[in-house]
Amino acid sequence: MLKDPKQVHAPNFGVVVSVRGSVVDIRFDESLPPIHRLLRVVGIFIVIEVLAQRDARVVRGIALTPTQGLARGMRVEDSGGPLTAPVGKAIISRMFDVFGNTIDNGPLLNNVQWRSVHRAPPTLSQRSTQSEIFVTGIKVIDVLVPLERGGKAGLFGGAGVGKTVLLTEMIHNMVSHHNGISIFCGIGERSREGEELYREMKEAGVLPNMVMIFGQMNEPPGARFRVGHAALTMAEYFRDDESRDVLLLIDNIFRFIQAGSEISGLMGQMPSRLGYQPTMGSELSSLEERIANTEDGAITSIQAVYVPADDFTDPAAVHTFSHLSASIVLSRQRASEGLYPSIDPLQSSSKMATAGIIGERHYNLAQEVRRTLAKYDDLKDIIAMLGLEQLNVDDRKLVGRARRLERFFTQPFFSTEQFSTMEGKLVSLDDALDGCERILADEFADYPESALYMIGAVDEVKINNKAAQHTKQQKEKNNGSTDVN
């Protein structure tokens, strides 16, 4: 919602002198509005944010709403303040747009404060560093790419490899076990996905500890560019004012960069490499640096990052990598093989994967798993050309272990139960480590690889095998009885 600040300000009106798409030039004869000031067109709901002062009388702004109906000569009013976001306990379990308007058909907001979305990150003296693992219940992440409580993790992948599904599953697993507040920020994604997520969270009963805010792909670039700042303003309130831990989920950070690129082009800035805005680094930093820990609380952020054409050297991906404590890379090759979640264990990394933080046993197991998978990756070309039989005995055993590990790291998700008909599984870190240890010890060498596919804890292999044998015996017994008759 658009709110005037509490202080009284003299009315200040301007006139539209130029409209080019979402970019609007406005002349003010009396007082020139400062950068980030919000302007409103008189008589029509169009909101403009000032991004530049062209000269002593004209400002250039970007529209945060569609500009249909806007024309030269229209009067524009200075709102007297910047874009604001609602904060307070009343925003919990609600869904908002970039202006702080509720979009869930619920009652009007009461007892909320309105704070500017343009806030400075915590100073170095205010920051706090912690080394604590954030368990997700997803085997491959908890074992090989452990997340940091109060850290930033990125889910990198091209189109259709499972970023949103993985993010939704992490929401399901973590929101129900997370003691703090969870905030979901949808930037430039499909409206359908936002509606589905809201319904799923409501049915799962986790909305009482959740806030959702959306700037979807049908909205102007200005709205998509600012919705991340609005979400962070809400997160900072719970961290600083209520001393609570916050889980901030962003889908998709690339769309934030893309919106900035659109704005940069509309503003007439010279593009840099691959057409991105020259200010991409500073714009991304202004968002990412606000995601920080203080003595009062922590903001843990998990961000989906679309990678254009699967090119991980793309400037958007490279700039995002540098801000993260954990990078989870999704592989199209693994997705095509049906190995879901399609996380590439060799490309993914985490700064938490050190013996001093996760312990000697976990660290040594993770390293042994990586070595096994890396060696198998090296042998794939030989296997493709000459066949598995041409390998020596030790290499054949290693390949068997690696393939069983790959299948053990698959996992049925709660968020896909309605599509896959497989019941979702939440696996503890101890069960995941125990499974890796036993597979590396060749305990399941006599079991088919498929027995480890889409299971939870590794003990399910033996349980399922016994059930399969019992079913087979029953069928044989029934067939025998039929033959006698």
Curated annotation (Swiss-Prot):
Membrane topology field: Peripheral membrane protein
GO cellular component, as recorded: plasma membrane; proton-transporting ATP synthase complex
One Pfam family named in its UniProt record: ATP-synt_VA_C
Keyword annotations: ATP synthesis, ATP-binding, Cell inner membrane, Cell membrane, CF(1), Hydrogen ion transport, Ion transport, Membrane, Nucleotide-binding, Translocase, Transport
EC number(s) recorded for this UniProt protein: 7.1.2.2
Cross-referenced Gene3D superfamilies: 2.40.10.170, Bovine Mitochondrial F1-atpase, Atp Synthase Beta Chain, Chain D, domain 3 (1.10.1140.10), P-loop containing nucleotide triphosphate hydrolases (3.40.50.300)
Class of the enzyme per the UniProt entry, highest EC level: translocase
GO MF annotations, alphabetized: ATP binding; ATP hydrolysis activity; proton-transporting ATP synthase activity, rotational mechanism; proton-transporting ATPase activity, rotational mechanism
Function: Produces ATP from ADP in the presence of a proton gradient across the membrane. The catalytic sites are hosted primarily by the beta subunits.
PANTHER family assigned: ATP SYNTHASE, ATP SYNTHASE SUBUNIT BETA, MITOCHONDRIAL
Recorded family membership: Belongs to the ATPase alpha/beta chains family.
Quaternary structure (record): F-type ATPases have 2 components, CF(1) - the catalytic core - and CF(0) - the membrane proton channel. CF(1) has five subunits: alpha(3), beta(3), gamma(1), delta(1), epsilon(1). CF(0) has three main subunits: a(1), b(2) and c(9-12). The alpha and beta chains form an alternating ring which encloses part of the gamma chain. CF(1) is attached to CF(0) by a central stalk formed by the gamma and epsilon chains, while a peripheral stalk is formed by the delta and b chains.
HAMAP family in UniProt: ATP_synth_beta_bact (MF_01347)
UniProt-recorded name of the protein: ATP synthase subunit beta 1
Origin organism lineage: Bacteria, Pseudomonadati, Pseudomonadota, Gammaproteobacteria, Alteromonadales
